[in-house]
Design a protein with these regions (language model features):
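Acidic, serine/threonine- and glycine-rich low-complexity intrinsically disordered segments
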Residues: 111-212, 223
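N-terminal mature-domain "stem" immediately C-terminal to a signal peptide or N-terminal signal-anchor/transmembrane
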Residues: 2-47
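Signature of long, low-cysteine stretches enriched in small and polar/charged residues
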Residues: 56-107, 172-239
């Protein structure tokens, strides 16, 4: 189905896809090798050292509901001059430590942060994984695990999660992928909510992945009827290139045409990115 609106290509984790241009990202959450990662813009003229100091200060600042600031236990550099630090951020759990690092690429106007919390005593192992991950990040790459305009060009791991949401003009879209130990067909997610009417349920191949598509119509209190579309691929065990995939979109019934266009654009353009492992 050809879309009547211009589209924009997006990337979340291991996948590329397109959405109608009006839809804008509401935020993403990314995790690879059990490490939380996030890309942020680096303002023109900003120095990597300045970006690091700001990120470290934000991490150590008291969290909501707490008056205690985090404790910096060691600041150092990973191979390649990537600034990093060990911290204790949970006063009630002195056995927990957090490793934070930030790789900034001024030429690309971007920086990527990496953060993980774990038990004290395994610091050397964590630093080794961080070093490998930091050097694998390539600004502007169209391969690997995407963080936005850059990506970790590294072997897919058995532990990866990626999610992103979009919204515009009453339409909401959510993207979720996660590696699994066993296939999860999301049967609980496919159960009809009370009062919902099943419009369509079918097997549908999306980007080479055989999943289940479901469309329902349900009451939306005070707003009439709402349409909810869902597609799920169960995933393959411990396979970063075939994670569990959950794609969803929703809108009020009067926006059915725009919702259909958005949905078909998403599913018809969904593609696995080249791993590009090196």
């Amino acid at each position: 189905m050809a879309t009547s609106l211009p589209t924009v290509t997006h990337a979340t984790g291991r996948f590329d896809y397109a959405l109608p241009a009006p839809l804008r990202s509401s935020g993403s959450q990314l995790n690879i090798y059990l490490i939380d990662v996030a890309q942020s813009p680096l303002p023109a003229g900003a120095l990597p050292a300045q970006a690091w100091k700001a990120r470290l200060a934000a991490a150590l600042a008291p969290k909501s509901g707490s008056h205690a600031a985090g404790v910096l236990t060691r600041e150092f550099e990973l191979p390649g001059g990537v600034p990093a630090a060990w911290m204790r951020l949970t006063p009630s759990r002195p056995d927990l430590v957090t490793l934070l690092a930030l790789r900034a690429v001024p030429q690309a106007g971007a920086a990527v942060s990496m953060e993980v919390e774990g038990s004290a005593g395994r610091e050397p192992l964590a630093e080794g994984v961080f070093a490998d991950l930091a050097k694998s990040w390539v600004a502007g790459s169209t391969q690997g695990f995407s963080t936005g305009t850059g990506a970790f060009v590294i072997q897919p791991s058995q532990n990866e999660r990626a999610s992103e949401s979009f919204a515009a003009s009453g339409i909401e879209v959510s993207i979720q992928t996660e590696t699994v130990e066993e296939p999860d067909d999301g049967e609980s997610s496919l159960q009809l909510p009370q009062g919902a009417h099943l419009v369509l349920k079918q097997h549908r191949n999306v980007g080479g992945f055989d999943g289940v598509e479901r469309r329902v119509r349900l009451a939306d209190e005070g707003a009439g009827e709402r349409l909810s579309y869902l597609w799920i691929f169960a995933g393959k065990p411990a396979d970063g290139t075939a994670p569990r995939i959950r794609l969803a979109a929703t809108a009020l019934a009067p926006r059915a045409g725009a919702l259909d266009e958005t949905w078909n654009t998403l599913l018809s353009t969904w593609r696995l990115r080249p791993a590009g492992a090196r």
